[in-house]
Swiss-Prot record:
Residues 1-56 are cytoplasmic. Residues 29-39 have a biased composition (Basic and acidic residues). One of its GO terms (cellular component) is plasma membrane. It comes from the Eukaryota. It is a single-pass membrane protein. The keyword Magnesium does not apply. This is Putative transporter-like protein YIL171W. One of its GO terms (molecular function) is transmembrane transporter activity. The chain crosses the membrane at residues 57-77. Belongs to the major facilitator superfamily. Sugar transporter (TC 2.A.1.1) family. It comes from Saccharomyces cerevisiae (strain ATCC 204508 / S288c) (Baker's yeast). It is found in: Cell membrane.
Length: 109
């Protein structure tokens, strides 16, 4: 640990940084005056208020969102119901294939 200096906070002093560092570089201003000072906005300018819409204006959007959400719910419900129905022993006994190792029929291939 010979490279580490154990100095207290009181012993630290400021030193001059490298002249090539980005911190010491002068600010760059163009001839058009692009600087932070040119971004001053008038404090007297009033903010623009958005028009307030009644809740009835959002009724159609709310109904459409509910219908879309309900459609996703029904899709999941339907898929779960059909999957459970196909696995019932009575359904397999009546409509199942006797040779299940064959896979799909030749009509579907």
């Amino acid at each position: 640990m010979s490279g580490v200096n154990n100095t207290s906070a009181n012993d630290l002093s400021t030193t001059e940084s490298n002249s090539n560092s980005a911190v010491g570089a002068p600010s760059v201003k163009t001839e058009h005056g692009d600087s932070k000072d040119s971004l001053n906005l008038d404090a007297t300018e009033a903010p623009i208020d958005l028009p307030q819409k009644p809740l009835s204006a959002y009724t159609t959007v709310a109904i459409l969102c509910l219908m879309i959400a309900f459609g996703g719910f029904i899709f999941g419900w339907d898929t779960g119901t059909i999957s459970g129905f196909v696995n019932l022993s009575d359904f397999i006994r009546r409509f199942g294939q006797k040779k299940t190792t064959r896979g799909l029929t030749t009509y579907r291939k």
